[in-house]
Amino acid sequence: MAFRDQPLGELALTIPRASALFRKYNLDFCCGGKQTLLRAATRQALDLDVIESELAALAETPLEKDWQAAPLAEIIEHILVRYHDRHREQLPELILQATKVERVHADKPGVPKGLAKYLSLLHEELTSHMMKEERVLFPMIKQGMGSQAAGPVSVMESEHDEAGELLEVIKHTTNNVTPPPEACTTWRALYNGINELIDDLMNHISLENNTLFPRALAGEK
């Protein structure tokens, strides 16, 4: 099966573990989910045949949940429990760990200087963002008013882009979330947590941008 002409966001939602594969190749399937695999791979000079082969192998595994066919209210509930609640747990702990690592290892060349600040910015942005979704956009969609939500959706997508930009800064600050050989247990735990956060947030944004929002705007109830 040829995947090159399909949007990244669609592939991430329909092929198990495709999102992890895209992360490995640094392909943006959340905020950049509307671009085709061909375009995204070409822009980074990646071997498209290799990526398609890996996708074909992943596609043989049954999909646990087809969110493209799920009711919108079920998608919203999943987002609230799986992502909103989880982000509220993740970020405060990561900020504490980053603050400790920066303080204790301040004299080491591999220390992620500024990481706690960037995580705090992301925490502030996401806290405000999720509150707006929970108080304004999600109730509109659940009440069958999604087709009238173009304004709120546009704002949410713009904020998704801003969160994506912060993730790139965080990846740059942490050497693509790769701990140096001398990293202590706390440092490694911090980077494991950041990798989990990035995976969660990218899947979260992808589900909203590429499934929930388009279907709501199209008038689905």
UniProtKB/Swiss-Prot annotation:
Cited InterPro entries: FeS-repair_YftE, Hemerythrin-like, RIC_family
Keyword Iron: yes
Record GO terms (molecular function): metal ion binding
Keywords assigned: Cytoplasm, Iron, Metal-binding, Stress response
Protein's GO biological process: protein repair; response to nitrosative stress; response to oxidative stress
Superkingdom assignment: Bacteria
Gene Ontology cellular component annotations, sorted alphabetically: cytoplasm
Listed Pfam families: Hemerythrin (PF01814), ScdA_N (PF04405)
The keyword Ribonucleoprotein is assigned to this record: no
Compartments, as annotated in UniProt: Cytoplasm
Job of this protein: Di-iron-containing protein involved in the repair of iron-sulfur clusters damaged by oxidative and nitrosative stress conditions.
Sequence similarity: Belongs to the RIC family. YtfE subfamily.
Subunit record text: Homodimer.
PANTHER family in UniProt: IRON-SULFUR CLUSTER REPAIR PROTEIN YTFE
Name the record gives this protein: Iron-sulfur cluster repair protein YtfE
Organism: Cronobacter sakazakii (strain ATCC BAA-894)
